[in-house]
Amino acid sequence: MDFGSIAAKMTLDISNFTSQLNLAQSQAQRLALESSKSFQIGSALTGLGKGLTTAVTLPLMGFAAASIKVGNEFQAQMSRVQAIAGATAEELGRMKTQAIDLGAKTAFSAKEAAQGMENLASAGFQVNEIMDAMPGVLDLAAVSGGDVAASSEAMASSLRAFGLEANQAGHVADVFARAAADTNAETSDMAEAMKYVAPVAHSMGLSLEETAASIGIMADAGIKGSQAGTTLRGALSRIAKPTKAMVKSMQELGVSFYDANGNMIPLREQIAQLKTATAGLTQEERNRHLVTLYGQNSLSGMLALLDAGPEKLDKMTNALVNSDGAAKEMAETMQDNLASKIEQMGGAFESVAIIVQQILEPALAKIVGAITKVLEAFVNMSPIGQKMVVIFAGMVAALGPLLLIAGMVMTTIVKLRIAIQFLGPAFMGTMGTIAGVIAIFYALVAVFMIAYTKSERFRNFINSLAPAIKAGFGGALEWLLPRLKELGEWLQKAGEKAKEFGQSVGSKVSKLLEQFGISIGQAGGSIGQFIGNVLERLGGAFGKVGGVISIAVSLVTKFGLAFLGITGPLGIAISLLVSFLTAWARTGEFNADGITQVFENLTNTIQSTADFISQYLPVFVEKGTQILVKIIEGIASAVPQVVEVISQVIENIVMTISTVMPQLVEAGIKILEALINGLVQSLPTIIQAAVQIITALFNGLVQALPTLIQAGLQILSALINGLVQALPAIIQAAVQIIMSLVQALIENLPMIIEAAMQIIMGLVNALIENIGPILEAGIQILMALIEGLIQVLPELITAAIQIITSLLEAILSNLPQLLEAGVKLLLSLLQGLLNMLPQLIAGALQIMMALLKAVIDFVPKLLQAGVQLLKALIQGIASLLGSLLSTAGNMLSSLVSKIASFVGQMVSGGANLIRNFISGIGSMIGSAVSKIGSMGTSIVSKVTGFAGQMVSAGVNLVRGFINGISSMVSSAVSAAANMASSALNAVKGFLGIHSPSRVMEQMGIYTGQGFVNGIGNMIRTTRDKAKEMAETVTEALSDVKMDIQENGVIEKVKSVYEKMADQLPETLPAPDFEDVRKAAGSPRVDLFNTGSDNPNQPQSQSKNNQGEQTVVNIGTIVVRNNDDVDKLSRGLYNRSKETLSGFGNIVTP
């Protein structure tokens, strides 16, 4: 065979193919440019959509979800309140409004307020009582630390226990708050104590304030909470039913806790009686009586009240009575910080969320009801129907991922399309390689044909392979044909089921469309016409594309193997061998004729392919470009295959579920019909109102917006152009102005500094000279301002109250009208918005297109202007750099020289300033010293004169004091005794007593140094007057008889006297009390039976050691109560002790 002829015949002239590829490359570049613009616009819109979604849509959806959650919790809580309180719908509405309002205005949320309402309702409060008590409950919660539930419980128990009205809840909170502020009892401690003692205290007549004051005093002593409550409860309970021991103890103490009407006296009076009755008792005696009266467990608390005394208890009670406003004030103080304000803001947000939930609740209720019905229908379906619904849901769920994959494919195709323009040269470079490969392939084919024809051994080997290949393909075909038959039958059934499903859906959809005035025929005709037009436009192009793709499949497969790793001649040989075997099997003749036919077909195929590419490649590129531009993101080439695959999947699924789909479709259509009917009935009104409002609001804006945009762009362009042109001149002028200012400042700096120094010195001198008048005038002005403010303040307060009252009355009186107007305005706005929606969308599109076009058109100008601006700036700086450096150097040099020359003047001026300042201060010091000296002299003279007056006043005061007492000696024994103690030095000389007087020592201490001189001058007169007073008292008592009332006093005197007698020394006889009684009518009382009638007889020890004697003369004594008896007994006892001490006897206390 002639190999040269074979090679010449197999050589392919690819010049036409190359030219067509060059044309396709230019078309691809133009397509890439257009796609790039579209891709940029799409990216911008995508970014805008993402930004709006992230910044607006998602936060609003999140807030709506949170609002629904918060609102549902609040509604559930209020339903509990309604159920417990038995509230009607109208009462529930009022309570909801109050809870929302309290949540917005306080640091507590509306839900917390609702929980407080629940606790009050559980305590038996009615709706009106709950609403009256809630502000006080929240005030108490704010003071106690924020637990609304505990505060409401404490409030309810306190109000009920003391029989208070619910509107007194605020006062209860004020009492708790004031007690917490003034004592160690926190509000939680007070609430805990009230749980135990409040009912008992109220039943015994104690008020809330007095009980709280008692608990507070106990808390100061460390008795808090439940311990204080049980202590006070135990004490009051024992008093309510006293035992015999308690009655005896009360009789011994002389106390009574009930009045004549059988009512318990206030607690402060009880404390007063106990404090007086136990004043003279020892600690053991007092504790014994208190334990008897109040019990062992209440001893500590009652001791705390006794130690505090009735005055502190009464003061605390009055403070709690007048404590209105304390809780609010304390709560405001405690919440005056950022954390509390944030909590209050959270409460306000929750109130807003509840309002939003209330607005959405009707629509949400309908949606939930519809979903519930759908779920109930699903539950009631047959098992087969339920399975079909699940399958259909899975299909719908898969639609999203499929669309996602499709979108990714579209995006990838766009990116590949952009990359085509860069692959063009590479494809052109590979054309030579492809031509060489084709030539090698032809050579191999020629060699194979020669070997098969000339070599019998090779031909026999090839022929022996034919049966094996045929057997293999035959077995595969025998297995495949039954499967394809089964698949065809299955697809036929699927088609029938799909037809039935389509008829069912079509009938239902037809009925639905008829409600809107649309027939299924019209809809089908329109859809069919649309699909037909699309297929007609795409049919020819896809036909040609399909022919090209079918030819290129084998080549793509061969080069794919090489791309996967089988590279070089071996990979190409393997791919060619696979293609050859496939073509040979396709002929069905596994012999030499088949091989010859393969090569003939291959030759014809290559020639046909080359002709096809040369002829149709330009048309293919043009049509492909048009399709990629018109169909989004160039997916047209992949859409048919994707649609075919998806259609097959959907057909298979539809065939499976078609048996149960009619029932499901019927149920779904019924639900949809109900929803659409409701929407259709209300939709015209909504649309009409919305369109009117939107039209009114945005019509003018839409009409004027294009003009505004165009004018704005023109103005901006003109400004930029003008700025670019004038920038060099502006920079040069600015530099010149700055240099001129700096140079002028340097030249005039000495004069400026000198003038400043003169001004400062003048101000200092004037200030030093006039500091006194300035201060005096300032004080006068300040006093005048204060006096004027004080005079006007009541009027200002009155006017402010009137203004606030008038403003509140006006707001409250017009609140319904304001709310109604707001609602109408909101509805009108929504109606206009809906009416204007089409125009708004159209206007928005126009604006977007205009902005996009303006941006695209203006970018080159903006870049050009920026370049010109940068050039001008660089040129201006370069041209002025030299002058700037020169001017800066000159300015620095001049500034340094001027400062150096002015240093001397500055030092001199500073020295003068300091010198003048010191001189001024020195002159002022002399004046100040003079003033202080004169002031001291005046003070000393005043004090000296006043000292003389004090001495004189002291003498006169003592003289008058003694004269007054002397004149009143005969009127009262008590006055005589006090006067005798005041002049104790004279009395002890008269009676022969030598012990010091404590009373005189105290009187000397408290009289003061001012009386020292006067007392020194009056010592002799005082001694004479004291002797005269003692003699007068003795003479007066000798003529007086004792008169003691017999109403139980004698027994008291006897008890005290016996105690006194037990303290006498053993050397003295113990006088009998009956002797004392018998001697009561005698002016002389011989207590020790000495037999002496002379009261002035010296008292000395007798020879038989019978003891000393004491003579006491007692006049008439009027006993008014037990205190007088105590004073008389103690006076006798003390006088006896003094007498015995005067004789040197040791008297035990």
Swiss-Prot record:
SUPFAM superfamilies: ARM repeat. Gene3D superfamilies: Leucine-rich Repeat Variant (1.25.10.10). InterPro entries: ARM-like, ARM-type_fold, Phage_tape_meas. The chain crosses the membrane at residues 389-409, 431-451, 561-581, 689-709, 726-746, 781-801, 840-860, 865-885. GO terms for biological process: viral tail assembly. Keywords: Host membrane, Membrane, Transmembrane, Transmembrane helix, Viral release from host cell, Viral tail assembly, Virion. GO terms for cellular component: host cell membrane; membrane; virion component. It is a multi-pass membrane protein. It is found in: Host membrane; Virion. Residues 1084-1109 are annotated as: Disordered. It holds the Pfam family PhageMin_Tail. Residues 1094-1106 have a biased composition (Low complexity). Plays a role in virion tail formation. The length of the tape measure protein is proportional to the length of the phage's tail. This is Tape measure protein.
